[in-house]
């Protein structure tokens, strides 16, 4: 996503800015396919740890709860922001597995304080993520040039409670997940796709962009490509980024409604209306449900909140390094959460807050599961991401330590609405094996009241 001020740039400069900010590639297209790239999810299986408290709901594994599930939840709202790891936002959070000591190859340093507005983007493409991961040693960040310039150690920076007090307030009042992993070692495009489809067609990065078609998906020009992992040959190939894969709307039972709030479509630039990358939605009647973020306010006021919602910022409040300041982004999030909590819907709603990818920031916990083709260069899992679960029935003041991943969010939606797993339609989907997040809730507890917070004055 790009600042509106960049729209005044000359065309070549604007193109360079788009590609740099989004981590795009200059690949050329060899073939145009759906990009599924294979039919298996790899031979590895999830290793799910046990919560430190007794279960109060269904099995925590994605495969363990296949029968009808009775909960009071009628609405799920998934809020996706941009580019931060767990350590970056919650490394010093009490009771969570964080660290304030950052590991380099030959030394350990105190993790520096991260600035509200970062001076540059950090490399978070697939190859940079593999470098950072360094075969699970979690000490390769210094080999990426953007991580440290003039000794600022930016990639190891952290925000503490004084930097993001409202996010910390939510984490203290509700449930914070400290073992929630990205499904891909990589960037925004596949990360966003996993929230909708529990897969990304094996895409490893972002599509290239053109000035006339600055969208990530089916509306891009015919020459646009994205690199995907071909699981048949264990090589990369370039395909058109319009994937014929199932997504959550395909499995929701009749009468369960949905919307994606995140489009400023046909307003340059536009990359994170991610249903644009799913052929069956973009070129079907479901595209009418992809709307602007302002429509969420209208739907709450008009008593028309759908059962399943995704909320994604397309502007300067996305918290993406070098684009959106963190304070401004937190205020944006708080504004919408306040609306939901003050509405008639709070009593039966779950709000899930997380990130699309790691953004190039340091995290000290090695991803516990590798899948894809090559164990030395796995597709995922990626690095830990912040996860805050807010609901009257989220366990209060609870750190959810079970291993989970981006595909856990589609799995949670499926469990709440008694929908089949997407993996039953396409084995590439990762929801069938993913933790369903149910042990983050106590359906029998006294409901937690709304936590209405004040937006802050920003630097």
Where are these regions (language model features)?
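Ser/Thr-rich, Pro/Gly/Ala-heavy low-complexity intrinsically disordered linkers and tails
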Residues: 1, 6, 15-69
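N-terminal pro-sequences and low-complexity stem/linker regions of secreted or lumenal proteins
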Residues: 39, 64-459
